[in-house]
């Protein structure tokens, strides 16, 4: 069967659609945000494909797999087993790295265990165990006739006269020994100074090199190795200064005896006690109480320079008072003006020195005690270590910072594992290379003999997997990069690379916007990868808005015509050209140029005197860059993937602004020199795509603050007042008005053991979340449940006479969310929808015109028409005098910005510089800018 037939799909907002898709093709599903693309791709096709495959397994196996809900569809024919690659961040486990997720690290561990050469950490000598035959062969390779002696080092740098050692050697029949580098007969030894360190090597054999010595040498080596615990020396007989050769029969340093057991893959795993650094347990970082977060240096101790140790906490404040009296400093002096010595005593303690403390007990008596002062930091460390309360830990964690582990310097591995070499690099050195460079290194690595044979297969796997990561535009990442620092787009492309590495055939892959976070330049490589996946013999279904991806597809499905209740229908399907020619397809209109996002006729000029100036930013790969952001304009930060955009804006500019303007104490900015210009602003808002809530109880009404006035309206109805109902009666989070059978969830979870848990509608309230008495209260003929079921569009009309509500509902409509329900569960909102709910909350606040808004890729999940709406909102914020900074790859957003900052020139270590600044027109003329290169034809086309 060469087709996938879908009949009667009604999942979520799909309106009983019938669809026939070709198999083994690249299919793009597009349409407005919220039109039903994910409902078709993930909740129907993927859910059914995965469910059928899992159902073919035994009941025992099924209990270990999470099964998806059966989609609401009549029939689907021609399905293959399905694999979905979504945008979710990979892992929040601090032990996950790019290397471990892609499994490249497992191959690297195997490579280093099987062909690695351990070296002594102190003397840099290879620790190689040799057999006696190998030792004999090496000696016989010397020029014939060479006079040599074989020595056994019996004492190494030890104090004493060592008389017992010499007696033992004489008893065994030895005649000569070398003491501190000089040869002596054992009967004519000098007296040794027992206060000094000495080295003694006994002469086991003296010989001239010739071919028939094999048997004699083997016996002599055996004797020497037995005497000196596996170590033997060969030195020239006549030349005391001559170079000697050290032989070892075990993995040990012949100089200091540093030994290592046989190399095993577990020695290179930081998730195994055998390989993890014992200081940081393989995490690479140590937590510490950061005094910068702990102390407000501008306040006095009495005012609360250290939270919890001010006047309000009598016990601790009495302690500080006694300490101040003992050391002679004032509690009324700003902490920053106290001497360094006094600051150290307060924070780190008085050591062993006792201090006289006076405490006022509950009865008003003064109690005197003399003891050392623990210090605020040790006090917090002890409380953090000993407490069993999660709340206390959470509170104290706000003051914790992290720093690289002092022992392993962030490499996570123990000392032995850090000193094993393959070629010219250790394992930490390889994992610290950008993937592109690591790929080149292993591609050129040549190992000879037995090692070469063993390594060949492992190297082939490593090189292939690294190349797949390069192909999806991730050549700038390093293998030791922590997984929780990856963006959604990066995480998805890593999964994509892993799937290509698996080389499966006949599978249905479903991807969710793989182009997120990719610069136009890297997009071509990604599309080639998707084609490669299709050419292997797979059906590749992509939910995508990217123009290039739609044009390249074999088959396009456009869902619409609107979003939410207005969507869920197939508007157009067929080749890209057929969709472009379709009169009703919104996507087709934008692709064919009948509709377009217009470039502003003129740019808002910048005022050079009003700028945010960030100097010397050095976080991650940033190379001491100076950033200037014009105040009151829409600035777009662009650059290829991995060039340092997020580090510059999210990790440096935002924490600095949030600390200065919002008083955030738990945010730490990446290294930089100075920040200027924040005095022109009054607050900063970071609008990201994280969920607005992680439980079904969170919804747009609660998040935007609409629900409170709605509950107040219901509590003000005469019937409510006569019954004594307050606003709390209409909350489904507290007892009173909610249905107690389902605790206000509307659903009841039923555990099904080896089948997926199912949520069944609550029998008591019929999914309405409230009890019967609460639902009897009506406002304008509707009860609270019916209001929550309204779409934003309907609610706007319904509450038209309530200005506070009408304004907030209007802003939700302005950001393109007219179709979502007021009470829609936050867990069902896409990333783009969650971001727009946050945007609307900001828009509905009273505007001071002095806010800095930061958005990271706000076009994720947005169709051309949605982008137009988003731009209208951003321009509206800008027109009110606010400063908007957007990190973006979408050329439609870039071309409408007032000012561009382009980072590059490449990603990773080859990036981290600001290579161009200016208006879109200026940037398009700059040869060094990749963004300008793609922007130029677009501006020319739009101006035409």
Swiss-Prot record:
Q: How does it assemble?
A: Forms a heterotetramer with UvrB during the search for lesions.
Belongs to which family? Belongs to the ABC transporter superfamily. UvrA family.
**What task does this protein carry out?**
The UvrABC repair system catalyzes the recognition and processing of DNA lesions. UvrA is an ATPase and a DNA-binding protein. A damage recognition complex composed of 2 UvrA and 2 UvrB subunits scans DNA for abnormalities. When the presence of a lesion has been verified by UvrB, the UvrA molecules dissociate.
| Entry protein name | UvrABC system protein A
Where in this chain does the entry annotate a coiled-coil region? none
One Gene Ontology cellular component term attached to this UniProt record is: cytoplasm
Show where the ABC transporter domain sits: 309-586, 606-936
Per its UniProt record, what InterPro entries does this chain match? ABC_transporter-like_ATP-bd, ABC_transporter-like_CS, ATP_grasp_subdomain_1, P-loop_NTPase, UvrA, UvrA_DNA-bd, UvrA_inter
Annotated compartments: Cytoplasm
Q: Which UniProt keywords apply?
A: ATP-binding, Cytoplasm, DNA damage, DNA excision, DNA repair, DNA-binding, Excision nuclease, Metal-binding, Nucleotide-binding, Repeat, SOS response, Zinc, Zinc-finger
UniProt GO molecular function = ATP binding; ATP hydrolysis activity; DNA binding; excinuclease ABC activity; zinc ion binding
Cite the Gene3D superfamilies for this sequence: ABC transporter ATPase domain-like, ABC transporter ATPase like domain, ATP-grasp fold, A domain, P-loop containing nucleotide triphosphate hydrolases
Zinc finger intervals, C4-type: 253-280, 739-765
Q: Which SUPFAM superfamilies match?
A: P-loop containing nucleoside triphosphate hydrolases
Q: Which residues bind ATP?
A: 31-38, 639-646
A GO biological process this protein is involved in? SOS response
| Originating species | Pseudomonas putida (strain ATCC 47054 / DSM 6125 / CFBP 8728 / NCIMB 11950 / KT2440)
Principal location class: cytoplasm
């Amino acid at each position: 069967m060469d087709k996938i037939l879908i009949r009667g799909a009604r999942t979520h907002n799909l309106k009983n659609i019938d669809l026939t898709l070709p198999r083994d093709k690249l299919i793009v599903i597009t349409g407005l945000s919220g039109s039903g693309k994910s409902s078709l791709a993930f909740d129907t096709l993927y859910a059914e494909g995965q469910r059928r495959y899992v159902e073919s397994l035994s009941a025992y196996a099924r209990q270990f797999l999470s099964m998806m809900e059966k989609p609401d569809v009549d029939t689907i024919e021609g399905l293959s087993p399905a694999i979905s690659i979504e945008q979710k961040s990979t892992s929040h486990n601090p032990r996950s790295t790019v290397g471990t997720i892609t499994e490249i690290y497992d191959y690297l561990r195997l490579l280093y265990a099987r062909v690695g050469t351990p070296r002594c950490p102190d003397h840099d000598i290879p620790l190689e165990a040799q057999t006696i035959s190998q030792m004999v062969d090496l000696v016989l390779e010397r020029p014939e006739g060479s006079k040599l002696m074989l020595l056994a080092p019996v004492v190494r740098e030890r104090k004493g006269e060592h008389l017992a050692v010499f007696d033992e050697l004489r008893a065994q029949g030895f005649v000569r020994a070398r003491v501190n580098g000089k040869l002596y007969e054992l009967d004519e030894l000098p007296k040794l100074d027992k206060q000094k360190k000495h080295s003694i090597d006994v002469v086991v054999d003296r010989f001239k090199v010739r071919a028939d010595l094999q048997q004699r040498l083997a016996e002599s080596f055996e004797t020497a190795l037995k005497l000196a615990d596996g170590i033997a020396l060969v030195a020239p007989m006549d030349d005391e200064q001559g170079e000697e050769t050290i032989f070892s029969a075990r993995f040990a340093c012949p100089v200091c005896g540093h030994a290592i057991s046989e190399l095993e893959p577990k020695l290179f795993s930081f998730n195994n006690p055998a390989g993890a650094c014992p200081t940081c347990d393989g995490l690479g970082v140590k937590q510490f109480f950061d005094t910068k977060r702990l102390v407000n240096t501008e306040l006095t101790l009495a005012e609360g320079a250290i939270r919890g140790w001010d006047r309000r906490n009598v016990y601790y404040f009495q302690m500080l008072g006694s300490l101040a009296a003992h050391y002679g400093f004032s509690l009324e002096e700003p902490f920053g003006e106290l001497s360094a010595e006094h600051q150290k005593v307060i924070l780190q303690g008085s050591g062993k020195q006792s201090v006289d403390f006076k405490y006022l007990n509950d009865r008003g008596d003064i109690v005197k005690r003399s003891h050392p002062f623990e210090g605020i930091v040790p006090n917090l460390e002890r409380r953090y270590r000993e407490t069993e309360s999660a709340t206390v830990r959470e509170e104290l964690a706000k003051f914790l910072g992290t720093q690289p582990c002092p022992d392993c310097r962030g490499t996570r591995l123990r000392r032995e594992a850090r000193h094993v070499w393959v070629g010219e690099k250790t394992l930490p050195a390889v994992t610290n290379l950008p993937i592109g460079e690591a790929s080149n290194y292993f591609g050129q690595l040549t190992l000879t003999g037995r090692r070469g044979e063993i390594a060949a297969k492992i190297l082939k796997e490593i090189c292939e997997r690294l190349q797949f990561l390069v192909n999806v535009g991730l050549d700038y990442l390093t293998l030791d990069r922590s997984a929780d620092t990856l963006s959604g787009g990066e995480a998805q492309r890593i999964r994509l690379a892993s799937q290509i590495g698996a080389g499966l055939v006949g599978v249905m892959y479903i991807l969710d916007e793989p182009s997120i976070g990719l610069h136009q330049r890297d997009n071509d490589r990604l599309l080639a990868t998707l084609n490669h996946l299709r050419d292997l013999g797979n059906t590749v279904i992509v939910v995508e808005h990217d123009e290039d991806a739609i044009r390249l597809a074999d088959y396009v499905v456009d869902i619409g015509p609107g979003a939410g209740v207005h969507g869920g229908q197939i508007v157009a399907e067929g080749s890209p050209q057929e969709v472009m020619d379709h009169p009703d397809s919104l996507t087709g209109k934008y692709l064919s140029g009948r509709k377009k996002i217009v470039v502003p006729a003129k740019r808002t000029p910048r005022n050079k005197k009003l700028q945010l100036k960030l100097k010397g930013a050095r976080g991650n790969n940033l190379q001491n860059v100076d950033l200037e952001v014009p105040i009151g304009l829409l600035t777009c930060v662009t650059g290829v993937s991995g060039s340092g955009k997020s580090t510059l804006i999210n990790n440096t500019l935002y924490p600095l602004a949030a600390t200065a303007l919002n008083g955030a104490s738990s945010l730490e900015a990446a290294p930089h020199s100075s920040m200027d210009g924040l005095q022109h602003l009054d607050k900063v808002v970071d609008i990201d795509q994280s969920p607005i809530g992680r439980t079904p109880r969170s919804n747009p009404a609660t998040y935007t603050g609409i629900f409170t006035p709605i509950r107040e309206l219901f509590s003000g109805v005469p019937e409510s007042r006569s019954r004594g109902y307050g606003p709390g009666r209409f909350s489904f989070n507290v007892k009173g008005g909610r249905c107690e059978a389902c605790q206000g969830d509307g659903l009841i979870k039923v555990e099904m053991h080896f089948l997926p848990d199912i949520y069944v509608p609550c029998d008591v309230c019929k999914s309405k979340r409230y009890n019967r008495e609460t639902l009897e209260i009506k406002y304008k003929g509707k009860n609270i449940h019916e209001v929550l079921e309204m779409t934003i569009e309907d609610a706007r009309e319904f509450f038209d006479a309530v200005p506070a509500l009408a304004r907030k509902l209007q802003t939700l409509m302005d950001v393109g969310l007219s179709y979502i329900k007021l009470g829609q569960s936050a867990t069902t909102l896409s990333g783009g929808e969650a971001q727009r709910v946050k945007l609307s909350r900001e828009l509905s606040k009273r505007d001071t015109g002095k806010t800095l808004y930061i958005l990271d890729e706000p076009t994720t999940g947005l169709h051309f028409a949605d982008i137009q709406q988003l731009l209208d909102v951003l321009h509206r914020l800008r027109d009110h005098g606010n400063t908007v900074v957007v990190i973006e790859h979408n050329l439609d957003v870039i071309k409408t910005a007032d000012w561009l900052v382009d980072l590059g020139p490449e990603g990773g270590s080859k990036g981290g510089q600001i290579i161009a600044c200016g208006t879109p027109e200026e940037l398009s003329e700059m040869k060094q800018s990749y963004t300008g290169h793609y922007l130029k034809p677009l501006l020319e086309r739009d101006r035409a």
